[in-house]
């Protein structure tokens, strides 16, 4: 099982270059496979949208918390590391035009020599998506087409370019270079907590990252993903399952449970009370030692 660590944005310093490099280099040194960056293009004060991962419906982040663009952050980290994977968790797909996003992801993957893993989400904050020009109510249908656009542009190498004629996006003779480092393109995972996210992962995703789910809810989502994959003529086992945990609580017993569920990767967060980068580093080091990574 591969292990990633989420950038602890709640500490408020992820826009500091020395801070983020210390975090990333420490993760690489300790044997973690990747770091994962989150996204909010804007945060809207007093949003009317309920945050789905808290019983209060409110995000734990203050409005003025540093939230760097995840792809720019990962590009910065790529140049200062050698083998560390570069992931998002999640990139809010409705905030991005897929033609532009395809170029950005391909460039990052090419320059990092294939270290990129993108987990896409549809977002929960209506005001954020609408501020970016997105259609909140139709974002699921648009996302399906956006994924097809990106993969078509990455695969298109012929002299005539790429034609695409969809409901939301259309172009003819389009050339988008450089291509991703990997011929199969940048891996696109689907993150979310809804049945729609699970089904989308089964139909279209290279992986599924269920967010905020445990117990029967998690089992149900995994089943929904696998049934959707089968219905689409895909091998459910080819859709990598990514599970979450906190750094202090992960041990071999939890790893074994993740393996039994079919997980190939785990994404780990610092404890809510970590409070500082030095404490996060201590949690990372202790986790790596428990699991024999160092």
Q: What are the roles of these predicted feature ranges?
A:
Residues 1-294:
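Active-site-adjacent structural elements that line small-molecule/cofactor binding pockets in enzymes
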């Amino acid at each position: 099982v591969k292990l990633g660590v989420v950038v602890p944005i709640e500490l408020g310093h992820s826009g500091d270059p020395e801070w983020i490099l210390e975090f990333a280099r420490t993760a690489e040194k300790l044997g973690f496979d990747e770091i994962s960056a989150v996204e909010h293009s804007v945060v809207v004060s007093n949003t009317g949208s309920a945050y789905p991962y808290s019983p209060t419906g409110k995000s734990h982040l203050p409005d003025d918390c540093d939230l760097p663009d995840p792809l720019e952050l990962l590009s910065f980290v790529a140049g200062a590391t050698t083998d560390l994977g570069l992931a998002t968790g999640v990139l809010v797909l409705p905030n991005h035009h897929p033609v532009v996003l395809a170029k950005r992801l391909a460039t990052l993957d090419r320059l990092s020599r294939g270290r990129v893993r993108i987990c896409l989400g549809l977002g929960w904050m209506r005001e954020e998506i609408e501020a970016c020009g997105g259609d909140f109510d139709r974002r699921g249908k648009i996302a399906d087409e956006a994924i097809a656009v990106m993969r078509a542009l990455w695969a298109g190498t012929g002299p005539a370019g790429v034609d695409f004629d969809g409901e939301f996006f259309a172009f003819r003779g389009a050339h988008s270079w450089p291509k991703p480092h990997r011929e199969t393109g940048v891996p696109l995972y689907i993150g979310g907590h809804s049945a729609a996210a699970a089904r989308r992962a089964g139909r279209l995703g290279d992986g599924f990252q269920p967010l905020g789910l445990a117990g029967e809810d998690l089992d149900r989502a995994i089943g929904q993903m696998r049934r959707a994959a089968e219905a689409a003529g895909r091998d459910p086992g080819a859709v990598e399952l990514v599970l979450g945990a906190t750094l202090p609580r992960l041990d071999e017993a939890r790893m074994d449970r993740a393996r039994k569920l079919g997980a190939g990767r785990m994404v780990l967060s610092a404890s809510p009370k970590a409070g500082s980068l030095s404490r996060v580093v201590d949690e990372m080091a202790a986790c790596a030692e428990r699991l024999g990574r160092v």
